[in-house]
Amino acid sequence: MSSTISLKPTHLILSSFSTGKVLQFRRSRFSHTPSSSSSRYRTLVAQLGFRPDSFDFIKDHAENLLYTIADAAVSSSETFESVAGTTTKTTQSNDWFSGIANYMETILKVLKDGLSTVHVPYSYGFAIILLTVLVKAATFPLTKKQVESAMAMKSLTPQIKAIQERYAGDQEKIQLETARLYKLAGINPLAGCLPTLATIPVWIGLYRALSNVADEGLLTEGFFWIPSLAGPTTVAARQNGSGISWLFPFIEGHPPLGWPDTLAYLVLPLLLVFSQYLSIQIMQSSQSNDPAMKSSQAVTKLLPLMIGYFALSVPSGLSLYWLTNNILSTAQQVWLQKYGGAKNPVEKFTNLVTKEDKTQQIEKSFSEPLVQKSVSELKIPREKGGEKVTPECPKPGERFRLLKEQEAKRRREKEERQKAEAALSNQNTDKAHEQDEKSDTAIVAEDDKKTELSAVDETSDGTVAVNGKPSIQKDETTNGTFGIGHDTEQQHSHETEKR
């Protein structure tokens, strides 16, 4: 690199056109100062989050946003200005992104030399892929932290919605209760933004490194079907407004590069569009219940086409980096969200009573005056004398403690009630057994009685017959002995008299 020369503003670099009309158009449409850029970004976020059907906004600002990202990433690389047919070469500025870009460029060259030493074909292409994998692995802990924070925030969405409905119109109260909820859950709402912000300098540095290598003419070798990783265009050509001049206009029915090379260069942007579309479909299916994801589906459908268009105006080495990064990012998100790679830090946080249905059930079952008072005061402020009177809130943690005590009391009452029901059931069972035993005894006695009655029949002359035959009657005689039946005794006396 030569000595450092301060760069002109980015909007002047973008406005190097041959005609004044186009120059004025580019300056007014794509210029961006720091103040206007931050305002544009805030507007873009608001549009993406709350108005997904804003097609006019996307049409007017999509290309502007893409050029802004590209210029921010390569503003310190070698750029060219076309002034009266001459080209002036500028160098990197001494911003802190340049240091990262220099390190990335050095690592890329070391990887390329190492692969060339072991005679690996397409060494620069594989060096780009390997460098992307290394950077992705280095930033993986931050990505995991960001996904876990997003999962935690998604888990608390019902509680936050209940707080917003309960204190509707009182933004200060909503913020206070939401902050208390975050504190009880032990999460930081900014934890999901910080990892993403931390990875931005790394990826911008990598982008600049690849741009510098392409501008230095080091990516002249091909990669499988790609004729050259430095083609079909350059960053400087895109900045001059001729990024897709290799496609149009046709010359005698043929593109400027000819059909074979043109089709070969088109394969990589098409793969990038397909991979981006597939990534969006996978992520939307994994977040199908996320309201924020549903509201941005209309915008994300256009994202693959915008990225594909942008890939047409940069060297193929950058497109190869985007494709590799997109595949790795999709694989990371799928593993973290679908296969348990990331753990929800608030998964066990189930003791918060902030959902509307649970709150209503608890409020209806409260019987203590103190709890009734605290709940009613927290729910809505009373009006007295035409003025809105907001009662004092209980001490921090007081309401939660009362709720826990009430819940424990109801649990004890439920257990006692279950024990009483079990004892009553056992008592009823014992009584039923006793009644069954009594009824069985009565039935047996009745059967015995019927048997005796059927076996014993009285005759008409006063004798007792057993089974229809005369039986011996047990009579006590005057001398205390037992005699024979009356008929037998008379027969014996007659026989004695005859003798």
From Swiss-Prot:
Q: What happens when the gene is disrupted?
A: No visible macroscopic phenotype under normal growth condtions. Increased number of plastoglobules (lipid bodies) in chloroplasts.
List localization entries.
Plastid, Chloroplast thylakoid membrane
Reply yes or no: does the keyword Magnesium apply. no
Mode of membrane association: Multi-pass membrane protein
Transit peptide feature, positions: 1-45
Enumerate the transmembrane spans: 115-135, 184-204, 263-283, 302-322
Q: Which UniProt keywords apply?
A: Chloroplast, Coiled coil, Membrane, Plastid, Thylakoid, Transit peptide, Transmembrane, Transmembrane helix
Q: Using the UniProt annotation, give all residue ranges assigned to the region (Disordered).
A: 378-499
Q: Name one Pfam family in it.
A: 60KD_IMP
| Coiled-coil stretches | 397-436
Does the keyword field hold Transmembrane?
Answer: yes
Q: Which InterPro entries match?
A: YidC/ALB3/OXA1/COX18 (IPR001708), YidC/Oxa/ALB_C (IPR028055), YidC_ALB_C (IPR047196)
Q: Gene Ontology terms, cellular component aspect?
A: chloroplast; chloroplast thylakoid membrane; thylakoid
GO MF annotation terms: membrane insertase activity
**Ranges of Basic and acidic residues composition bias in the record:** 379-420, 430-452, 486-499
Q: What NCBIfam families does the entry give?
A: yidC_oxa1_cterm
Q: What family does the entry list?
A: Belongs to the OXA1/ALB3/YidC (TC 2.A.9.2) family.
**Annotated function:** Required for the insertion of some light harvesting chlorophyll-binding proteins (LHCP) into the chloroplast thylakoid membrane. Plays a role in the accumulation of some cytochrome b6f components in the thylakoid membrane. Required for the assembly and/or stability of the F(1)F(0) ATP synthase in chloroplast thylakoid membranes. Functions to stabilize or promote assembly of F(1) during its attachment to the membrane-embedded F(0) part. Participates with STIC2 in thylakoid protein targeting. May function with a specific subset of thylakoidal proteins.
Name by which UniProt lists this protein: ALBINO3-like protein 1, chloroplastic
Please report the organism this UniProt entry assigns to the protein.
Arabidopsis thaliana (Mouse-ear cress)
